[in-house]
């Protein structure tokens, strides 16, 4: 069976790390993120992918000590792999950014470019990103992939 690779957007990691979500409105986002990530971690044929762009977003939103702890977790976990963008990704992201009249951040365009080149499934809750990304790649919310 082929390996399935999921590129998890920073918003999903932030849901988990910051315990985001309102339990009075159903299952909190952090719990859905935790369940999704655990499903991948305990699978035989799935992995999580991240990039420096995800790390930059996390660094901006997390306290320094928490960020360092999470980076260490990423590096030590065998089911979580790091990928680097190349010139092709930057070019495609610039093209996407222009097509969208700069309504989507360059980092989000880079997420799409990486997923396209590496055939990754983008996992996010960002509705604007989902709307545009689905024209180019497979994109899902974590709750849609939990049975």
Which ranges hold each PLM region?
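Residue-level signal for well-ordered alpha-helical positions
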Residues: 19-20, 61, 96, 135-136
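Short, well-structured N-terminal submotif of metal-dependent ribonuclease cores
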Residues: 1-49, 62-69
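Active-site neighborhoods of divalent-metal-dependent phosphate/nucleic-acid chemistry enzymes
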Residues: 80-125
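Helix-adjacent hinge/juxtasegments
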Residues: 65-72, 80-83
């Amino acid at each position: 069976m082929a390996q399935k690779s999921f590129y998890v957007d920073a918003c999903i990691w932030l849901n988990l790390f910051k315990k985001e979500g309102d339990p009075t409105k159903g299952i909190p986002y952090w719990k859905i993120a935790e369940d999704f990530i655990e499903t991948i971690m305990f699978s035989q044929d799935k992995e999580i992918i991240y990039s420096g762009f995800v790390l930059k977003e996390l660094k901006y939103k997390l306290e320094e000590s928490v960020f360092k702890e999470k980076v260490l977790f990423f590096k030590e976990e065998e089911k979580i792999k790091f990928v680097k963008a190349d010139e092709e990704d930057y070019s495609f992201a610039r093209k996407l950014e222009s097509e969208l009249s700069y309504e989507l951040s360059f980092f989000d365009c880079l997420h799409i470019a990486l997923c396209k080149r590496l055939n990754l499934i983008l996992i996010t809750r960002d509705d604007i990103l989902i709307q545009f990304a689905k024209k180019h790649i497979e994109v899902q919310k974590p709750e849609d992939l939990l049975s």
